[in-house]
């Protein structure tokens, strides 16, 4: 736990690391969204505040590109306990998102949004998401932002500030995106590391703890997890009344998830399915479990292998083959 009300900001992290930033762009972002949308146990505003393409004038872009040929794009997502990520953002926008499927729930619960009601406010005069697009995809406004930045800056760094594994297939569409940094929940002081990493003072050594897919909707768990796979508890009338009296955000539905996949989730499914010829691994997986780059390179060599009944022991020698210190 930490004091989330006074965290180290991204701007402070960059300044402390010696970076200078474009004042016009900084002011644009700070003025556009002085207060962030809230996603909590009792309130779920899934809005992704982002200035539209029209907010970036020609003069602003000309000044920015003259200032530097390098740009940092930050994409953020939230979510957490009692805030399962929506699988149809367009429906959230229009207030019709119904996680209580009509074929598995009594009609008196139809239309309820899980435990709490969810909302979304568009950034422009268009819908940020098309029907069926989920929360871990880029919004239309974010797509416009990435395209604009990559069309104007030679070097682009993408920072993903999200605890959940987003769809990042769009990264491969732009040759000038030279780096993607995964920066999940930073707590009070975690963001201080970002500036140090970007400046080269610190060599990153983190690895992905999830499998990053090119299309999350093709994951076996997609239709059985979170709001998309909710089953509804029955015989809960007494509990519904008690909770409803104490929690005004309660919508009258208690849900659960059926873990039908067993152990075959994440890398266990994709590596097994590829080995058995069910899928082409590279068509599904963008970044595998345990993936991560640094400012140096390594080689690994198995130097010993032992099997003892039902246990295996493998010894690996790791060698830094690059020019700077690092960890692997």
Language model features with spans:
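C-terminal non-catalytic regions of proteins with extracellular/luminal or membrane-system context
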Residues: 1-328
């Amino acid at each position: 736990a930490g004091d989330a009300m006074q965290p180290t900001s991204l701007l402070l992290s960059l300044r402390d690391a010696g970076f200078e930033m474009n004042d016009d762009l900084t002011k644009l972002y700070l003025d556009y969204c002085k207060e962030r949308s809230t996603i909590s146990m009792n309130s779920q505003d899934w809005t992704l505040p982002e200035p539209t393409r029209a907010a970036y004038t020609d003069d602003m872009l000309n000044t920015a590109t003259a200032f530097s040929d390098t740009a940092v794009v930050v994409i953020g997502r939230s979510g957490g306990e009692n805030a399962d990520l929506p699988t149809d953002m367009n429906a959230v926008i229009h207030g019709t998102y119904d996680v209580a499927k009509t074929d598995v729930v009594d009609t008196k619960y139809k239309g309820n949004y899980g435990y709490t009601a969810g909302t979304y406010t568009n950034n422009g005069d268009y819908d940020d998401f098309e029907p069926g697009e989920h929360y871990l995809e880029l919004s239309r406004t974010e797509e416009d932002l990435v395209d604009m930045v990559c069309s104007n800056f030679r070097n682009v760094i993408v920072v993903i500030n999200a605890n959940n594994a987003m769809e990042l297939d769009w990264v491969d569409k732009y040759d000038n995106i030279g780096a993607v940094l995964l920066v999940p929940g930073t707590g009070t002081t975690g963001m201080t590391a970002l500036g140090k990493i970007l400046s080269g003072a610190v060599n990153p050594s983190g690895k992905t703890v999830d499998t990053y897919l090119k299309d999350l909707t093709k994951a076996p768990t997609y239709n059985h997890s979170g709001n998309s796979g909710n089953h509804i508890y029955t015989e809960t009338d007494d509990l519904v009344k008690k909770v409803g009296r104490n929690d005004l955000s309660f919508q009258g539905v208690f849900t659960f998830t059926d873990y039908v996949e067993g152990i075959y989730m994440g890398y266990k499914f994709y590596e097994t399915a590829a080995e058995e010829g069910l899928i082409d691994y590279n068509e599904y997986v963008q970044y595998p479990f345990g993936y991560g780059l640094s400012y140096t390179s390594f080689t690994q060599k198995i130097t010993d292998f032992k099997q003892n009944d039902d246990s295996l022991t493998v010894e690996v020698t790791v060698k830094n083959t690059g020019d700077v210190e690092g960890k692997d």
